[in-house]
Amino acid sequence: MAGQKIRIRLKSYDHEVIDQSAKKIVETVTNAGATVVGPVPLPTEKNVFCVIRSPHMYKDSREHFEMRTHKRLIDIVDPTPKAVDSLMHIDLPADVNIEIKL
C-alpha cells in the first residue's frame, strides 16, 4: 500500500474516552510497523440549548444545557497490510464514533 494514507476521525462526548481510544489506535498501528501522525486535537463543537424552566409561564426563568463533542484526527502514512488488519480487529468503546477514509 505504498503512497496511501488512512485518515481516522474520532468523535465522542467524553474527552477521556476519546484520548484512551486514540492512544490505543496509535499503539496498535505502530506495533504493526506503520508510521502515525497524531492524534491531532480538532476544535471542540459546543451546542447550547436554552429551555424555559416552567411549563406555562415565567419566561424570564430559563435553563441552559450544553453538549460538547470532542474530536481527534489520526493519519496513518504508508500503512502495512498488518497495520490494516490490526485496525480491523481493534476493540474500542461504544461511545466513540469512528470515521475511516482511505
Curated annotation (Swiss-Prot):
One of its GO terms (molecular function) is structural constituent of ribosome. GO terms for biological process: translation. GO terms for cellular component: ribonucleoprotein complex; ribosome. Keywords: Ribonucleoprotein, Ribosomal protein. SUPFAM superfamilies: Ribosomal protein S10 (SSF54999). InterPro entries: Ribosomal_uS10 (IPR001848), Ribosomal_uS10_CS (IPR018268), Ribosomal_uS10_dom (IPR027486), Ribosomal_uS10_dom_sf (IPR036838). Gene3D superfamilies: Ribosomal protein S10 domain. The keyword Ribonucleoprotein applies. SMART domains: Ribosomal_S10 (SM01403). Coiled coil: none annotated. HAMAP family: Ribosomal_uS10. Belongs to the universal ribosomal protein uS10 family. NCBIfam families: PRK00596.1, rpsJ_bact. Involved in the binding of tRNA to the ribosomes. Part of the 30S ribosomal subunit. This is Small ribosomal subunit protein uS10. It comes from Bifidobacterium longum subsp. infantis (strain ATCC 15697 / DSM 20088 / JCM 1222 / NCTC 11817 / S12). The gene is rpsJ.
